[in-house]
C-alpha cells in the first residue's frame, strides 16, 4: 500500500516505512504516540526531590525510594510516605507503638500525600536504635471524612506475610505487613549477564518457585537456587522467567491476583533469598525476567490496593463505570490515566530492576490492557484487519493503557540500555507493539506467539497424524508481523493448568503411568509420543520465532497438569509440584526427552538460528509429510509421516558444499532408533536447482524424525 510520505507524521514515519499497510492509520498511530510522549514530558518536567526537572528513570527511582517505609542509617529515623487522597487523617501503627492509633499521626499535603518520621529510640544499654524493629508488623490507619477509621497494609510495603494460625483465627487470614530492615543487607556478587538485544538468542525457562519441588509442598527460593538453577544451566537455557513473585494472598491464583506489588512473595522465603537466587543465576550467565502483573490487581481490601483510602477509584477506575473491574478475572483495573498510578507502576518496575536485579519483564495480560473490551467476547475475535486495532471507530483501544506500556518500555531502556528485555503477552496481534519507540512503536522486544500452542493442541485433539497439513503447520509457525519478534513455544503454564493437558500427556495419555520404564519393550503409543514431542518442540523452536520458551518440567515431558491447593481439591499439593524425580530415574524414558531438549538448546547456542531473519521454507510436502527450510545457514528437515521413511530424498539447499548432521532426533540417547549412521553421513550438494534452491542434497530421513544439518566448515567439535 502506498501513500504520500509527506502526509505521514514524523513521529511514526519509521514504522510506516517498515509496514506500508500502516499508512492509512499514520495519524492514529501518531496521536497514540503523542499521548505517551506528552505523559513523559509531564513526568520529566515535574520536580524531583531536589526541586529540579527529572528523567523518567529518576522519577521512578525517586518514587520507590521515598514512598513507603525507609530507614535512614545516618539518623536512624524511619520515614513513611503514602498517597491516600480520600483520607483526612492518617496514622502509622504497629507493634513498635503497641498499635496506638494516635501515637504517630501523619502530615497531609494538598495532594493527599501523607508523611511522618519515626525517631530513633534508646535501648536499655543507652544505644540508639531504629524506632521500628526489623520484621515487626505495621499498618496504616486512615480516618475518613465521616469520622470512621479503616486499616490497611502500606501500599509500598516490601514484605507481607501470612498470619499464624492463632492470629488468623482471631483476626482473619489477611496478610500482615512487616518492616523489612535487616542489620546486614544482601550484597550482589555477580554482574548481570551481557545481552545484545539485536543479535543474541533468548532461550527462556519459565518457572514458578513454589511448585519447583517433587514434594507436595511450597518450594522455597533456596531450594530453587540449589536444585533447579543447576538443571536450567545444564539444559542450556540463558534466561529464566519467574512467575508469582509479586505477593499474592491467594496461592491458587498462580500469582496473578497481586495484593502487594513491592513485596516479593514470602511463601517462598525472604527478600534476601530471592536476591541470592537472582545473583546465583547471573553467576551462571542466566538472565532473570519477572512476570509482572500490571494489567489488574486483587480485589482484596484489607491486604491489597482495593479501596485503599476508602474510595473505589484511587488506583483504579470507579466501580460506577464499566471499567472498574475485569469481567472474567474478578479483579480491579488500573486507571492508567492518573499521574499517581503511573508513578506507582513505573516505580514498581524500577524497584525490581534495582533492588532485585531483574533483567526485564514479561508483561501479563497486555491484551486486556490494550482494549476497553479486554479481548473478551466479540471484541476478542481478532481477524488481523488493521481497522480492529487502528480505526478510531472500531478499535476500542485504551489509549492511556497503551501510553503507560510505551513509558514502561522507555523506562526499561533507560535503566537497562544494553540488556533490558520486555515481552508482551498479547494474543490480539496489535501492530507496532514490538517495534522500537523511536520509530513510533510501543517498544516491546517480543510478544508471545500464543497461536502456536493452540495449533498443536488442536491437531493432537482433532486430527490423525496422517491428516496433518504441513502447509497449515508452516503457515501458523511463520505467521508473524514483519520486524516484530515473537517468543515461540509449544506450551507454557497456561497449557499445564488443571482441565488441560501437557503436550506429553496429549501424546501418550495414561501410557505415561505404565509404559515409560525401560525395563520393558516400548509401546507404539510411547514411541509415537516421544518422537512427536521432539519434532513439535524442534520445529517450533527453529521456525516459530526469534526466542523460545519452555515451562519447567515440560522439557522432559512432565505428565500431569497443575492444580494449586484449593477447596475443590481438599487443599492438596499433589498437582502443585514438578516431578523432577521422573527425569532423575535412569530406568524411565523421561531422560530421553530431557537429553534431546538439552541438545536442542546447545545446538541453538552453537549455531544461533533464533534472533535471525525468518527461515526460507523450500518444502511442505503434504503426501510425504516432509518439511524443509533453511535458517541462518542451517538446513532443517522434518519427516512427520507416521510410517514412511525415505531414502535418497531430495532436499533443496542454497549454499553448495558438504553438509553434516548437527542434531538428529532419532539418536538412541533421545529415545530414537539410531537408524542413521552419522559417522558415515556426509551430504554433498548437486549443482542443480531443486525447490527454488540452487542445489540439492539427498538424505535418508526416517519416519517421525528431524535432522539439522550444517556445512562441514561450520560444524563445531561435539556439534
UniProtKB/Swiss-Prot annotation:
Enzyme Commission designation: 2.4.1.18
Keyword Cytoplasm part of the UniProt annotation: yes
Protein name per its UniProtKB record: 1,4-alpha-glucan-branching enzyme
One of the record's GO molecular function terms: hydrolase activity, hydrolyzing O-glycosyl compounds
Keyword Endoplasmic reticulum: no
Family: Belongs to the glycosyl hydrolase 13 family. GlgB subfamily.
Compartments in which it is found: Cytoplasm
Enzyme class: transferase
Signal peptide: none
Cysteine pairs bridged by disulfides in the record: none
Gene: GLC3
Role, per record: Glycogen-branching enzyme participates in the glycogen biosynthetic process along with glycogenin and glycogen synthase. Generates alpha-1,6-glucosidic branches from alpha-1,4-linked glucose chains, to increase solubility of the glycogen polymer.
Keyword terms: Cytoplasm, Glycogen biosynthesis, Glycosyltransferase, Transferase
Record pathway: Glycan biosynthesis; glycogen biosynthesis
GO biological process: glycogen biosynthetic process
Binding site for (1,4-alpha-D-glucosyl)n: 99, 139
